[in-house]
Amino acid sequence: MSRRYLFTSESVTEGHPDKICDQISDAILDAVLAADPSSRVAAEVVTNTGLVLITGELTTQANVNFIQVARQKIKEIGYTNADNGFSANSCSVMVALDEQSPDIAQGVTSAQEQRDKLSDDQLDEIGAGDQGLMFGYACNETPEFMPLPISLAHRLSLKLSQVRKSGELPYLGPDGKTQVTVIYEDGKPVGIDTILISTQHTETIGALTDNTEIQAKIKADLLEKVIKPVFVGATVGLSDSTKFLVNPTGKFVIGGPQGDSGLTGRKIIIDTYGGYSRHGGGAFSGKDPTKVDRSASYACRYVAKNIVAAGLAEKCEVQVSYAIGVARPVSVMIETFGTCTVDEDRLLEVVQKHFELRPAGIIQAFDLRNLPSQRNGRFYQDMAAYGHFGRTDLDLPWERLDKVDILKQELATATVA
């Protein structure tokens, strides 16, 4: 008997309060690393009505105007009208950054292996910036090897922002959320059950002042300008039974930091796989690549994606764990949920042979310190909204499939009978 179930993932637009904070944190990271690639950064941001607070730890030789960076990012997102309670030009921006603890710095700068063995291996010079566990995931549900629910939710959120910024739907505000419920049968997506969009909007739309008429127009416009375009060419499409919910509270005029406070690192499931895979709990934004919450999660995605792309599994989850100041992972685990076509013990051996999972090795393989300067001062901030994985609009090193051939070659004789 086939098993039928529903799975839901959500996304938010770049104007969501928490995502404003993530983007400012990563804009600061970009600016600092572009000027001094060896910087240590842990930038946290809080927003509320008319207020931005930048806090955290920072060790750098760079001279960065953090207030200017924050205002520019807020303007780019679309908060330019003080009448909305939050504006790039009028909000207060406070900065309270401390230097990184020397107790942490000594462990990150000189790994425990090097101190014990006096090794000259440069990849052992940088230990993990903290203890912890990280996950990466990939599956064959979409061309970008992402779970379908989060892929669709992100595409809807991005399209929602695009039609606002282009002026196609000028009455939309920057704040918004999307949610997609996918129908599965025997683990395969077969349909779309529900699409939910909540979007900030103006009090009136043209001559329309009645809220019932306003909400009807918003729903009709979003169906034609946002939802249908996202599903063009989709392998799983809309149907007559698909439910569409738009602004189900009835109104969404007050939004952004005026409607809700924001904080860096509160959208970690949206940043990753939409709840489809496990999560180690660590956020990404505002953290330099010595923080394994970020860099090791990217490496795990790289491993999982290449495994699935090589046809070795239909879905793959990779976990690593670290001890602070120690370069080599404490543990590495690969889970393929019964879909692996080769011996899993042999697969783990090959992964550990060909994928660099030490923090310094990850940084070197992906060039994580230098990408901000190489890309005109912006790299991390472009992932701070709409996800860090499966981004076909960005050139992300952990999304490359350059390990597929070596995996196939090494595992050609390890096929499970």
Swiss-Prot record:
Q: Where in the cell is it found?
A: Cytoplasm
Keyword list (alphabetical) reads: ATP-binding, Cytoplasm, Magnesium, Metal-binding, Nucleotide-binding, One-carbon metabolism, Potassium, Transferase
**GO CC terms on record?**
cytoplasm
Q: Which GO terms describe its molecular function?
A: ATP binding; magnesium ion binding; methionine adenosyltransferase activity
| Pathway, per record | Amino-acid biosynthesis; S-adenosyl-L-methionine biosynthesis; S-adenosyl-L-methionine from L-methionine: step 1/1
The record's listing under Pfam families reads: S-AdoMet_synt_C (PF02773), S-AdoMet_synt_M (PF02772), S-AdoMet_synt_N (PF00438)
Record function comment: Catalyzes the formation of S-adenosylmethionine (AdoMet) from methionine and ATP. The overall synthetic reaction is composed of two sequential steps, AdoMet formation and the subsequent tripolyphosphate hydrolysis which occurs prior to release of AdoMet from the enzyme.
PANTHER family attached to this UniProt entry: S-ADENOSYLMETHIONINE SYNTHETASE
Its name, as the record gives it, is: S-adenosylmethionine synthase
The taxonomy runs:
Bacteria, Bacillati, Cyanobacteriota, Cyanophyceae, Oscillatoriophycideae
